[in-house]
Amino acid sequence: MEAALLVCQYTIQSLIQLTRDDPGFFNVEILEFPFYPACNVCTADVNATINFDVGGKKHKLNLDFGLLTPHTKAVYQPRGAFGGSENATNLFLLELLGAGELALTMRSKKLPINITTGEEQQVSLESVDVYFQDVFGTMWCHHAEMQNPVYLIPETVPYIKWDNCNSTNITAVVRAQGLDVTLPLSLPTSAQDSNFSVKTEMLGNEIDIECIMEDGEISQVLPGDNKFNITCSGYESHVPSGGILTSTSPVATPIPGTGYAYSLRLTPRPVSRFLGNNSILYVFYSGNGPKASGGDYCIQSNIVFSDEIPASQDMPTNTTDITYVGDNATYSVPMVTSEDANSPNVTVTAFWAWPNNTETDFKCKWTLTSGTPSGCENISGAFASNRTFDITVSGLGTAPKTLIITRTATNATTTTHKVIFSKAPESTTTSPTLNTTGFAAPNTTTGLPSSTHVPTNLTAPASTGPTVSTADVTSPTPAGTTSGASPVTPSPSPRDNGTESKAPDMTSPTSAVTTPTPNATSPTPAVTTPTPNATSPTLGKTSPTSAVTTPTPNATSPTPAVTTPTPNATIPTLGKTSPTSAVTTPTPNATSPTVGETSPQANTTNHTLGGTSSTPVVTSPPKNATSAVTTGQHNITSSSTSSMSLRPSSISETLSPSTSDNSTSHMPLLTSAHPTGGENITQVTPASTSTHHVSTSSPAPRPGTTSQASGPGNSSTSTKPGEVNVTKGTPPKNATSPQAPSGQKTAVPTVTSTGGKANSTTGGKHTTGHGARTSTEPTTDYGGDSTTPRTRYNATTYLPPSTSSKLRPRWTFTSPPVTTAQATVPVPPTSQPRFSNLSMLVLQWASLAVLTLLLLLVMADCAFRRNLSTSHTYTTPPYDDAETYV
């Protein structure tokens, strides 16, 4: 123990002052010891030295408390006492108080050291030294000096008991040296007519603790809480002792025979465990007023010491989330508040949260003069020129890992950092990514130009499935061609799984829409993997691209004669004079093609929000116009029930026993003034008040079928079944995420400086930073919560009627176009799908006939059974539906 004084790396000084009488024990509170957070095996080896003066001679008593385990035990006795009397270990206690605080308690009426005869009156306590060695081997020391020497006079304390004290059935509980009890009492006068004074005494096991009110009394008791401070004998705790007197009776309603009711709460400290569980709390109080003569009253309560572990013993911690790209990540630890450029003694430690081996997991420790510590794996660090300390971690894998970092300066001021490192998943998206300034990086694989519009809140998502690029809409891109996938940096929060991709400004038509689609004669294989999530909507852009399709998982009826392996429904080709027969009808379920299941999909999930898919799927090129409008649908969750319809359906459900999810939406109106041309096509939505309509025949959505992301494992952010989500007015340029309802708080992923592409979150919430913004438009949502159900209409569109959902929609083709206040560019007329319409009508009436026949059979069966039941003779009432007998 003598050598311990030489290895103290950090020392805390304190001055101890004893107040009033000696209660029979000395208590020294020791603050700011480092109990590391997120570490169940972080122990501390604690020793103490008690320095006495015996007739001018120094005497040391060394105590060994062993290893402290703050998560399992709160009270410790010395394992050994060196230089003390035989029973010295029974005279000391070390107790954890919570928040990194300790309390060392020693009996004062018994001597812990051996003395000679005649020295009994000459033993004084001078100081106390506590040595705290943490799991990193750092020695923390606390030196507590007595302001005045405290003489230990051994004596026998007689047993004290107060008579004429009313007993209560309330127990006073002591936790971490703090007593807390609430007692009912009565006073002869009401509030405002009474004063109040109180004192307490705790007796037991040769300990006598007295506490008195600091100001003597409350001169006037007021309605409500009357707070006061109290002072207890012995050591004054850094946590003040006090009490609260509260009137519980109405002002003019005394309790017969007792007076007015009050509630008294007392919280004295420190209360030593040396009292024992057989000790008693005595409360003496008085209340005198001008209208009644008062007197002294006494109530008593038993005291019990709790073995409950106190509130968190861990040091306060700052939490930071870091999402990084690549193989390593760096975190900079700033100087502590009391540190300057000349501080000579700085220590930085780091360990992974919840380690299981104290022999190998606590090797990462750096000082200003030390080099790279041995045994520190996956973590490296160095002091920078500005005194910050940069910690670099590597080889962490894909799962998030938590690193606990502490930094301590010369005066033992310590800050703790909890850093959660999360590696961004590998991206397969073709969308541009963000750099550290928030600008979209250009597409580097296809060489397509990126938009000149600078987004301020866009982040390329992590996607495990194929997507299609929308960086250039001047010419269709074969679906097998993907844009360069760059590392992405979304925070791995469940709120960030909405698909976001870069789309150019497409408010004007492209220059290549008059040329035939290169691959219009045959479906182009998009990818070799089926896309399970084919219900992602497209948002609000109004420019066409060449021969593209929108995923339509909600097929209206199965058709055996599918002429192409395309699993998605085709959009009508505009400007033709004859029906297009490329694909007669979409498959019932877009998640698994029923025809040509082994063939590659010709159109993968369209993840372009505000753009269009670039995969041509039309089987024959149109003559006059080569554009099939797919992106003016304004975030329609599911397609219409006919591949040639240009009018909104009047009925939201069909007879098809489809297992798809979103079967209640409809297509917006297209208008046309061009007789043959198809250039300058703009979709508009008719002005109409939207309401919610949910189909009763559509099954509940299966997991993963309405996701915005194309790969498995991405949480769904698309609209719910039966929902039409249409943007109002002109959509914002380069919108890359679904729209949120008005008033919904928008959570926006942000960009951090980690690796130039980190996206930080804190506590599972999004944080806003550089490159983030919040939409001010009432019907837009840049981000959103993927876990929040969105069942709404948030723009103008034709609504599905609330009539029967078992009828086929009425198809109209010759009605004049309905326009809105928006500027519209006409759309060329289309031919009527007579043969397709006729077959649908036949199927409709056939289905109705089958349903009618089934209904008649059920009615006949019910009548037959009822006739049979009435032919029997009952000796007791039959308990039929008409009457019940009791």
Curated annotation (Swiss-Prot):
It is a single-pass membrane protein. It comes from the Viruses. Residues 861-886 are intravirion. The chain crosses the membrane at residues 840-860. Coiled coil: none annotated. Residues 1-839 are virion surface. Keywords: Glycoprotein, Host membrane, Host-virus interaction, Late protein, Membrane, Transmembrane, Transmembrane helix, Virion. Primary surface antigen capable of inducing and reacting with virus-neutralizing antibodies. Almost all EBV candidate vaccines are based on gp350 proteins. Glycans are attached at residues 47, 87, 114, 166, 169, 195, 229, 277, 318, 328, 345, 356, 378, 386, 411, 435, 443, 457, 497, 519, 533, 554, 568, 589, 603, 606, 624, 635, 662, 680, 714, 725, 734, 759, 794, 837. One of its GO terms (cellular component) is virion membrane. Residues 428-437, 507-595, 638-660, 684-699, 761-771 have a biased composition (Low complexity). Residues 423-810 are annotated as: Disordered. It is found in: Virion membrane; Host membrane. Residues 442-488, 596-637, 704-720, 733-760, 773-806 have a biased composition (Polar residues). Extensively glycosylated. Interacts with host CR2. Initiates virion attachment to host B-lymphocyte cell, leading to virus entry. Acts by binding to host CR2 at the surface of B-lymphocytes, facilitating the binding of viral glycoprotein gp42 to HLA class II molecules. Attachment triggers virion-host membrane fusion and invasion of the host cell. Belongs to the Epstein-Barr GP350 family. This is Envelope glycoprotein GP350. The lineage of its organism: Viruses, Duplodnaviria, Heunggongvirae, Peploviricota, Herviviricetes.
